[in-house]
Amino acid sequence: YEAAYQAFVSKRGQIELNLREWMKPISLTPDNLHIGIHFLGENISAALQLGDISYVSGEVAWLKVLLKFHEAQPEQLIHFMKAYSEAVKQNINSQGKPISDWLTAEIEKLKAE
């Protein structure tokens, strides 16, 4: 996870910028979108440092609550996660594989709900 952590930290700003650009059409306010992006990034960074990306799964539950509170469609979280995965792939390529694999698994869980 060390390589993924280093790559994520060095490219996190660009990943989050891409994500904000791609997520403009959703029904969250820019502040709430920024909060979701920020805390997901913080949790990904911490989980990579701890050596287990699955620690971030609790963050997905929090994002679901945030979207529900703002009366957003559940599909928006799937869209958000796909966009995050794409931003990771685009900015850190194969070094981000643990992150994109985790995001893909979380997307599949969300689709199954």
Segments the model singles out, each with a brief description of its role:
Residues 1-82, 86-113:
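Core of compact, soluble alpha-helical bundle domains
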